[in-house]
């Protein structure tokens, strides 16, 4: 980051402050000039330098940030594959992901081989299952995030037939648990066929499959599927990975040495164990000639020529990055298979320039034909490069038998050329979120539609003002100018079937995968989500992520708030009226040899009031639930199946105890976050230090239940979910880099 404004870069980005901030804060190295930046990230390649300057192409975030600096990896993401069911391997994976984060890469791993909770360890002890290890991997991701300029990114997946699938589905219902990882369920054809049979009336909801082995258990697929859809509707996770399509629909389908195990964090790269993805994206909107006219069309000749330069440049990155992988195994896999991840962005802008409405039948046809062209010519470019540089070491002629290869319309001469030269790369296309680079160019990201064509930007992150101003996407202004308003649909205007059909059209000719989010309205029901996942599977998607508006607490708003920013204004609050009865939690706490009773009254499952006192006689009572009944002012009765306390206020031993419970109760009622109450109470010393410590210990049990909005770690604004990834429209931050 540099405070010196580079005028050339500012002009290149059309004077857009947000775009410039992204370039300056994320991709500029030590205040370098725009010309030096262009030279560094292009590696001196004149054609790539031209494509970047023309905004037709950009490398992925890690390459833009790190190329030529010698600092860290040029690859965005990696895969650890299956975590084996041994303590040694589990701990090794934890170390490996930490080292990968240090190198600025993300990680994906599958928990499917880890024995479930209750399974025996050495015929003596029962396993605690996957959850403790999920927590460990999450903590590692969080801790490395604190010490790096790039935040750790993690995907954990689990086979839906695993005994702990239900726990896996439910775990994110607590928004503070596993908050540094994306979760996806691995779902095979057998499971989805059962779901399809159910909706066709062939089987009932109680249909059960029994597993007998080291541990026996029953799976009820229909009920499990409904639970999955309910939680996806409420919490936007887990996502789903359709494993038969994910692992087999690629060029390496019949190559035994190449076994896909899971994906990178955003899901656009199914990878083998220790696989890596180098990412880049072509801005298709810049290939439209005669835009906003009846003669608009894609310049296929230019696109074909440029595709070779892109494949060549990405192949260079593989060799250049070998010294920067965190693990030798990652280096070995990169050398053997030479994976590429060439993606696209600006699809929606492209369609607008051609007068085509995103999601329409025509748009689906255009995207399908376009991706067929891109994939075919990427293969031909890789084959041409193989003729110059040699085949990738893991090449096998069985590639020509793969389903996706044979879906391409080939000329006889083209097939002959590929047979003769082979391929330089095992994978070619991968459509990533492009949250940061797409926002930097001020275009639609990946294959997503625009979330909003205008939004309010808080200028506080740019200067020290407290005002917002409305920002319009340049494409929208152009569309209005030329009378193309009918093309200005947003993600909210597009049905879930249209979202899926667009993704399916592209997926047919993307040999890895696509990161995309199906945005759905607030009133969406779990029953609708059930139909979404089924349709996505039937249409051949490799994975599916949904986002119901309002789930996981708010996404970014495209409406200006009528209220001042609450973080900058002092606001008085009014406590909700206390009902006669409150549910309550009863605790006995031992602290420094003394026993205390703490009773917490709950309103809507959140602490509303607290009563506490030191016990003169030690109680032998377990923690339990009861009720606090307000009999009259200064008379609060506690009742449960274990005991009755006629008046809680008469239990205080002194005025200090009464005061020490009165004040936190007032703070709770007025909505003060528990963590701040605890922080303040810990400052108390003297005669009642042990008493307040006991209260703090109880209150800390509720901090994990406090739900906070998902906000940008850079500027504090709300995030939007797009292409399976959280990004900020205010400062350009993207969770996926």
Identify the meaning behind each predicted range:
Residues 1-74, 81, 225-227, 234, ...:
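Acidic/polar, glycine-rich intrinsically disordered N-terminal extensions of enzymes
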Residues 4-14, 75-300, 323-333, 378, ...:
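Active-site cavity-forming subdomains of large catalytic enzyme subunits
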Residues 52, 56-67, 160, 311-322, ...:
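Core structural elements
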Residues 66-78, 86-110, 157-160, 164-165, ...:
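Conserved phosphate/anionic-ligand binding catalytic regions in large, soluble enzymes, centered on
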Residues 206, 212-214, 306-331, 357-434, ...:
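Internal maturation/activation junctions in enzymes
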Residues 260-263, 267-270, 315-322, 404, ...:
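Catalytic alpha/beta core of large soluble enzyme barrels
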Residues 559-601:
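Short, Gly/Pro- and small/polar-rich lid/capping loops
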Residues 712-715, 728:
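Short cysteine-rich clusters marking metal-coordination/redox-active sites
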């Amino acid at each position: 980051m540099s405070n010196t404004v580079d005028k050339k870069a500012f002009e290149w980005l059309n004077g857009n402050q947000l775009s410039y901030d992204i370039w300056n804060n994320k991709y500029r190295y030590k205040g370098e000039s725009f010309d030096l930046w262009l030279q560094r990230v292009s590696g001196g390649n004149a054609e790539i330098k031209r494509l970047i300057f023309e905004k037709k192409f950009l490398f992925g975030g890690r390459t833009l940030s790190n190329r030529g600096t010698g600092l860290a990896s040029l690859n965005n993401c990696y895969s650890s594959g299956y975590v084996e069911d041994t303590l040694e391997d589990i701990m090794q994976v934890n170390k490996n992901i930490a080292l990968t984060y240090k190198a600025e890469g993300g990680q994906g791993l599958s928990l499917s081989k880890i024995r479930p909770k209750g399974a025996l360890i050495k015929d003596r002890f029962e396993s605690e299952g996957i959850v403790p290890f999920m927590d460990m991997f999450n903590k590692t991701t969080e801790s490395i995030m604190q010490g790096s300029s790039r935040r750790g990114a993690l995907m954990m997946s689990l086979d839906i037939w695993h005994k702990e699938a239900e726990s896996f589905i439910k775990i994110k219902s607590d928004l503070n648990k596993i908050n540094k990882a994306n979760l996806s369920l691995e779902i095979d054809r057998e499971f989805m066929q059962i779901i399809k049979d159910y909706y066709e009336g062939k089987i009932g909801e109680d249909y059960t499959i029994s597993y007998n082995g080291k541990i026996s258990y029953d799976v009820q697929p229909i009920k499990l599927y409904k639970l999955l859809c309910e939680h996806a509707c409420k919490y936007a996770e887990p996502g789903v990975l359709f494993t038969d399509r994910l692992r087999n629909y690629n060029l390496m389908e019949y190559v035994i040495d190449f076994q896909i195990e899971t994906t990178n964090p955003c899901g656009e790269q199914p990878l083998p164990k220790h696989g890596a993805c180098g990412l880049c994206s072509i801005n298709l909107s810049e290939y439209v000639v005669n835009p906003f006219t009846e003669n608009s069309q894609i310049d296929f000749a230019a696109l074909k020529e440029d595709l070779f330069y892109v494949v060549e440049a990405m192949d260079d990155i593989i060799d250049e990055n070998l010294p920067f992988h965190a693990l030798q195994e990652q280096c070995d896999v990169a050398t053997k298979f030479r994976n590429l991840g060439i993606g696209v962005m600006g699809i929606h802008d492209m369609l607008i320039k051609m007068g085509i409405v995103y999601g329409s039948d025509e748009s689906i046809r255009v995207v399908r034909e376009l991706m067929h062209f891109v994939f075919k010519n990427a293969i031909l470019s890789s084959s041409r490069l193989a003729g110059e540089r040699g085949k990738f070491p893991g090449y096998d002629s069985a590639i020509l038998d793969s389903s996706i290869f044979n879906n391409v319309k080939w000329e006889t001469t083209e097939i002959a050329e590929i047979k003769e030269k082979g391929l330089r790369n095992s994978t070619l296309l991968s459509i990533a979120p492009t949250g940061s680079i797409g926002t930097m160019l001020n275009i639609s990201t990946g294959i997503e539609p625009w979330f909003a064509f205008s939004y309010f930007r808080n200028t506080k992150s740019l200067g020290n003002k407290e005002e917002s101003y409305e920002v319009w996407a340049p494409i929208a202004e152009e569309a209005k100018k030329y009378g193309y308003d009918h093309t200005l649909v947003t993600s909210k205007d597009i049905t879930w079937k249209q979202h899926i059909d667009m993704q399916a059209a592209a997926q047919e000719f993307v040999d890895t995968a696509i990161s995309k989010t199906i945005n759905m309205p607030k009133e969406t029901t779990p029953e609708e989500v059930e139909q979404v996942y089924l349709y996505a599977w039937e249409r051949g998607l490799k994975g599916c992520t949904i986002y119901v508006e309002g789930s996981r607490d708010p996404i970014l708003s495209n409406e200006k708030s009528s209220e001042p920013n609450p973080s900058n204004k002092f606001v008085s609050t009014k406590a909700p009226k206390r009902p006669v009865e409150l549910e309550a939690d009863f605790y006995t706490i031992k602290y420094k040899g003394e026993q205390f009773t703490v009773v917490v009254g709950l309103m809507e499952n959140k602490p509303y009031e607290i009563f506490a006192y030191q016990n003169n006689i030690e109680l032998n009572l377990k923690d339990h639930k009861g009720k606090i009944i307000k009999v009259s002012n200064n008379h609060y009765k506690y009742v449960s199946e274990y005991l009755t306390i006629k008046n809680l206020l008469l239990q205080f031993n002194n005025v200090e105890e009464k005061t020490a419970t009165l004040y936190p109760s007032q703070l709770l009622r007025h909505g003060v976050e528990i963590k701040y109450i605890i922080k303040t109470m810990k400052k108390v010393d003297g005669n009642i230090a042990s008493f307040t410590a006991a209260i703090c210990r109880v209150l800390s049990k509720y901090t994990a239940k406090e739900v906070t909005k998902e906000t940008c770690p850079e500027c504090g604004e709300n995030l939007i979910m797009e292409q399976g990834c959280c990004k900020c429209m205010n400062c350009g931050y993207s969770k996926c880099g």
